[in-house]
Amino acid sequence: MKLFKNKPVTHLNQIYFYLVAILILRLDLVFLNTMPTGGDMGAHVVPIKYFIENFALNLQLNGWSNDWFAGYPLYYFYFPFPAIVTFLFNLVFPYGVAFKLMVIGSILLTIYSFERLFRNMQSNFSIFGYIAGLTYILTESFTIYGGNLASTLAGQFSFTYSIAFANLAIAHLTKSDKNNRHVVSAIFFGFSLLSHLIPVLIYAPIYLYFWIKAKNTTLEKFSSGLIFLFITIRFTTSLITNLEYT
Protein backbone atom coordinates (compact mmCIF):
# COMPACT_ATOMS: atom_id res chain seq x y z
CA MET A 1 0.00 0.00 0.00
CA LYS A 2 1.37 3.38 -1.00
CA LEU A 3 1.70 6.03 1.66
CA PHE A 4 1.07 8.75 -0.90
CA LYS A 5 -1.11 8.29 -3.95
CA ASN A 6 -0.14 10.19 -7.07
CA LYS A 7 -3.15 12.42 -7.51
CA PRO A 8 -2.98 15.33 -9.92
CA VAL A 9 -3.02 18.76 -8.32
CA THR A 10 -5.42 21.14 -10.02
CA HIS A 11 -4.48 24.71 -10.89
CA LEU A 12 -6.96 25.91 -8.25
CA ASN A 13 -5.18 23.86 -5.58
CA GLN A 14 -1.84 25.30 -6.70
CA ILE A 15 -3.23 28.78 -6.07
CA TYR A 16 -4.10 27.76 -2.50
CA PHE A 17 -0.51 26.65 -1.89
CA TYR A 18 0.91 29.95 -3.12
CA LEU A 19 -1.64 31.95 -1.14
CA VAL A 20 -0.02 30.49 1.98
CA ALA A 21 3.34 31.85 0.82
CA ILE A 22 1.80 35.24 -0.01
CA LEU A 23 0.25 35.50 3.47
CA ILE A 24 3.74 35.14 4.98
CA LEU A 25 4.91 38.15 2.95
CA ARG A 26 2.45 40.64 4.53
CA LEU A 27 0.86 42.22 1.46
CA ASP A 28 -0.85 44.72 3.74
CA LEU A 29 2.58 46.30 4.26
CA VAL A 30 3.77 45.79 0.70
CA PHE A 31 1.01 48.00 -0.71
CA LEU A 32 1.75 50.87 1.65
CA ASN A 33 3.62 53.55 -0.30
CA THR A 34 6.66 53.48 1.97
CA MET A 35 10.36 52.86 1.36
CA PRO A 36 11.83 49.53 2.51
CA THR A 37 14.95 49.59 4.67
CA GLY A 38 17.16 47.10 6.46
CA GLY A 39 20.61 45.78 5.65
CA ASP A 40 21.64 46.85 2.15
CA MET A 41 18.05 47.51 1.08
CA GLY A 42 18.24 51.27 1.56
CA ALA A 43 21.33 51.46 -0.65
CA HIS A 44 19.41 49.84 -3.53
CA VAL A 45 16.47 52.25 -3.38
CA VAL A 46 18.46 55.18 -4.84
CA PRO A 47 20.11 53.55 -7.91
CA ILE A 48 16.93 51.79 -9.01
CA LYS A 49 15.03 55.08 -8.70
CA TYR A 50 17.71 56.80 -10.79
CA PHE A 51 17.56 53.99 -13.37
CA ILE A 52 13.79 54.42 -13.76
CA GLU A 53 13.88 58.22 -14.01
CA ASN A 54 16.93 58.59 -16.27
CA PHE A 55 17.70 55.36 -18.12
CA ALA A 56 14.67 53.13 -18.63
CA LEU A 57 12.53 55.43 -20.78
CA ASN A 58 15.57 56.05 -23.01
CA LEU A 59 16.06 52.28 -23.41
CA GLN A 60 19.40 52.74 -21.64
CA LEU A 61 20.71 49.83 -19.54
CA ASN A 62 23.48 51.72 -17.76
CA GLY A 63 25.09 55.14 -17.60
CA TRP A 64 26.41 57.83 -15.30
CA SER A 65 24.60 58.67 -12.09
CA ASN A 66 25.01 62.14 -10.60
CA ASP A 67 24.46 60.85 -7.07
CA TRP A 68 27.20 60.35 -4.46
CA PHE A 69 29.26 63.56 -4.81
CA ALA A 70 30.97 63.41 -8.24
CA GLY A 71 28.74 60.59 -9.47
CA TYR A 72 29.49 57.00 -10.42
CA PRO A 73 28.92 54.52 -13.29
CA LEU A 74 25.50 52.97 -12.65
CA TYR A 75 24.74 49.35 -13.66
CA TYR A 76 28.06 48.87 -15.41
CA PHE A 77 29.20 46.56 -12.62
CA TYR A 78 25.99 45.60 -10.84
CA PHE A 79 23.09 43.58 -12.16
CA PRO A 80 20.19 45.37 -13.88
CA PHE A 81 17.39 42.79 -13.90
CA PRO A 82 15.73 43.86 -10.59
CA ALA A 83 15.81 47.49 -11.74
CA ILE A 84 14.02 46.52 -14.97
CA VAL A 85 11.36 44.60 -13.01
CA THR A 86 10.84 47.58 -10.69
CA PHE A 87 10.46 49.87 -13.71
CA LEU A 88 7.70 47.63 -15.09
CA PHE A 89 5.86 47.59 -11.76
CA ASN A 90 6.33 51.35 -11.49
CA LEU A 91 4.27 51.82 -14.65
CA VAL A 92 1.25 50.85 -12.52
CA PHE A 93 2.22 51.38 -8.87
CA PRO A 94 4.03 54.14 -6.93
CA TYR A 95 7.77 53.61 -6.67
CA GLY A 96 7.76 52.39 -3.06
CA VAL A 97 5.14 49.74 -3.82
CA ALA A 98 6.82 48.79 -7.11
CA PHE A 99 10.15 48.28 -5.34
CA LYS A 100 8.60 46.04 -2.68
CA LEU A 101 6.68 44.02 -5.28
CA MET A 102 9.97 43.41 -7.08
CA VAL A 103 11.55 42.19 -3.84
CA ILE A 104 8.79 39.76 -2.85
CA GLY A 105 8.55 38.63 -6.47
CA SER A 106 12.00 37.09 -6.07
CA ILE A 107 10.77 35.08 -3.06
CA LEU A 108 7.68 33.71 -4.82
CA LEU A 109 9.75 32.92 -7.91
CA THR A 110 12.24 30.97 -5.77
CA ILE A 111 9.48 28.84 -4.24
CA TYR A 112 8.05 28.20 -7.71
CA SER A 113 11.49 27.33 -9.10
CA PHE A 114 12.04 24.66 -6.45
CA GLU A 115 8.57 23.25 -7.06
CA ARG A 116 9.24 23.18 -10.81
CA LEU A 117 12.65 21.57 -10.34
CA PHE A 118 11.17 18.73 -8.27
CA ARG A 119 8.48 17.83 -10.80
CA ASN A 120 8.67 14.69 -12.88
CA MET A 121 7.75 14.64 -16.55
CA GLN A 122 4.16 13.59 -15.85
CA SER A 123 3.20 15.89 -12.97
CA ASN A 124 2.03 19.49 -13.04
CA PHE A 125 2.88 20.18 -9.39
CA SER A 126 5.32 18.82 -6.80
CA ILE A 127 4.25 19.17 -3.19
CA PHE A 128 7.75 18.13 -2.10
CA GLY A 129 9.29 20.81 -4.30
CA TYR A 130 6.91 23.40 -2.88
CA ILE A 131 7.81 22.39 0.69
CA ALA A 132 11.52 22.45 -0.18
CA GLY A 133 11.19 25.96 -1.63
CA LEU A 134 9.16 27.22 1.32
CA THR A 135 11.62 25.66 3.79
CA TYR A 136 14.56 27.24 1.99
CA ILE A 137 13.17 30.76 1.96
CA LEU A 138 12.17 30.49 5.65
CA THR A 139 15.63 29.28 6.70
CA GLU A 140 17.11 31.62 9.32
CA SER A 141 20.63 30.20 9.61
CA PHE A 142 22.00 32.99 7.39
CA THR A 143 20.84 36.55 6.79
CA ILE A 144 23.11 38.06 4.14
CA TYR A 145 24.21 35.40 1.62
CA GLY A 146 21.02 35.62 -0.44
CA GLY A 147 18.20 33.30 -1.43
CA ASN A 148 16.21 33.08 1.78
CA LEU A 149 13.65 35.60 3.05
CA ALA A 150 15.93 37.15 5.68
CA SER A 151 18.71 37.81 3.16
CA THR A 152 16.30 39.08 0.52
CA LEU A 153 14.79 41.62 2.92
CA ALA A 154 18.34 42.69 3.79
CA GLY A 155 18.88 43.67 0.16
CA GLN A 156 20.06 40.43 -1.49
CA PHE A 157 17.11 40.17 -3.88
CA SER A 158 19.42 40.08 -6.93
CA PHE A 159 20.99 36.89 -5.59
CA THR A 160 17.53 35.45 -4.94
CA TYR A 161 16.35 36.16 -8.50
CA SER A 162 19.51 34.56 -9.86
CA ILE A 163 18.95 31.33 -7.90
CA ALA A 164 15.31 31.17 -8.99
CA PHE A 165 16.11 31.67 -12.68
CA ALA A 166 18.96 29.13 -12.57
CA ASN A 167 16.59 26.56 -11.05
CA LEU A 168 14.02 27.27 -13.76
CA ALA A 169 16.67 27.02 -16.48
CA ILE A 170 17.69 23.53 -15.35
CA ALA A 171 14.07 22.49 -14.77
CA HIS A 172 13.04 23.40 -18.31
CA LEU A 173 16.14 21.77 -19.75
CA THR A 174 15.63 18.48 -17.93
CA LYS A 175 11.93 18.16 -17.08
CA SER A 176 10.03 19.88 -19.90
CA ASP A 177 8.69 17.97 -22.90
CA LYS A 178 8.04 21.12 -24.94
CA ASN A 179 9.81 21.55 -28.28
CA ASN A 180 11.08 25.00 -27.29
CA ARG A 181 12.53 23.91 -23.94
CA HIS A 182 16.10 24.78 -25.00
CA VAL A 183 14.98 28.33 -25.87
CA VAL A 184 13.08 28.86 -22.61
CA SER A 185 15.96 27.39 -20.63
CA ALA A 186 18.49 29.72 -22.29
CA ILE A 187 16.27 32.75 -21.56
CA PHE A 188 16.03 31.83 -17.88
CA PHE A 189 19.78 31.26 -17.59
CA GLY A 190 20.37 34.62 -19.24
CA PHE A 191 18.05 36.26 -16.71
CA SER A 192 20.01 34.50 -13.96
CA LEU A 193 23.22 36.17 -15.14
CA LEU A 194 21.50 39.56 -15.39
CA SER A 195 20.43 39.12 -11.76
CA HIS A 196 23.68 38.01 -10.11
CA LEU A 197 26.97 36.38 -11.10
CA ILE A 198 27.71 34.15 -8.10
CA PRO A 199 24.76 31.71 -8.48
CA VAL A 200 25.56 31.48 -12.20
CA LEU A 201 29.13 30.42 -11.40
CA ILE A 202 27.76 27.75 -9.05
CA TYR A 203 25.05 26.51 -11.42
CA ALA A 204 27.05 26.79 -14.68
CA PRO A 205 28.79 23.36 -14.48
CA ILE A 206 25.45 21.69 -13.66
CA TYR A 207 23.66 23.53 -16.45
CA LEU A 208 26.44 22.75 -18.94
CA TYR A 209 26.29 19.05 -18.06
CA PHE A 210 22.54 18.84 -18.73
CA TRP A 211 22.86 21.10 -21.80
CA ILE A 212 25.38 18.71 -23.36
CA LYS A 213 23.35 15.67 -22.30
CA ALA A 214 20.05 17.07 -23.62
CA LYS A 215 18.62 15.34 -26.68
CA ASN A 216 18.49 18.45 -28.81
CA THR A 217 19.86 18.85 -32.29
CA THR A 218 23.11 20.72 -32.85
CA LEU A 219 21.11 23.57 -34.40
CA GLU A 220 18.84 23.79 -31.33
CA LYS A 221 21.82 23.87 -28.97
CA PHE A 222 23.53 26.49 -31.12
CA SER A 223 20.38 28.63 -31.17
CA SER A 224 20.03 28.39 -27.38
CA GLY A 225 23.62 29.60 -27.02
CA LEU A 226 22.89 32.55 -29.31
CA ILE A 227 19.79 33.44 -27.30
CA PHE A 228 21.80 33.40 -24.07
CA LEU A 229 24.43 35.66 -25.65
CA PHE A 230 21.79 38.00 -27.07
CA ILE A 231 20.23 38.48 -23.62
CA THR A 232 23.50 38.98 -21.73
CA ILE A 233 26.02 40.47 -24.17
CA ARG A 234 25.07 44.12 -23.62
CA PHE A 235 25.65 43.90 -19.87
CA THR A 236 28.64 41.54 -19.93
CA THR A 237 30.44 43.61 -22.59
CA SER A 238 30.15 46.84 -20.59
CA LEU A 239 31.18 44.95 -17.45
CA ILE A 240 34.29 43.34 -18.92
CA THR A 241 35.50 46.34 -20.94
CA ASN A 242 35.23 48.65 -17.92
CA LEU A 243 36.47 46.22 -15.29
CA GLU A 244 39.62 48.27 -14.65
CA TYR A 245 37.46 51.03 -13.17
CA THR A 246 36.00 48.90 -10.38
Predicted regions mapped to residue ranges:
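Membrane-embedded transmembrane-helix bundle of lipid-linked glycan/lipid transferases
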Residues: M1-T246
